[in-house]
Amino acid sequence: MKKNIAAFLASGAWIGISEFARNEILFKSYWIDKYAGLGLVFPSDNVNNAMWGAWSFMLAGLVVFLVRRLGLLEAVAAAWLAAFVMMWIVIWNLNVLPTGLLLFAVPLSVLEVALAALISRKIIEA
């Protein structure tokens, strides 16, 4: 049980750092421009940031669950599809996805989930 919790916390921290770096440091201007083009303000209040933190740990929980039951590649694929592909479909459908970001977001998000799975696997198997 302690290893599961440690894996959850470590992979959740990694996912949170990765998401922050990608969306607040690297690509925030893309998001702001996309929302401005729609006549909207990009939501980045504290409550929005807290929800992204919660999302990061929900994804970490999914990763830990899958890593314990599947092979590493299967766990990465399932978690990535469940978290990112479904999110992109929804925000594309709402017309708020800056599709040009996918060129960068796809490989970075696969890397994010893969490293979270590796972190989880190493902690669980230690």
Which positions does each model-derived feature cover?
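Juxtamembrane/disordered regions of integral membrane proteins
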Residues: 1-126
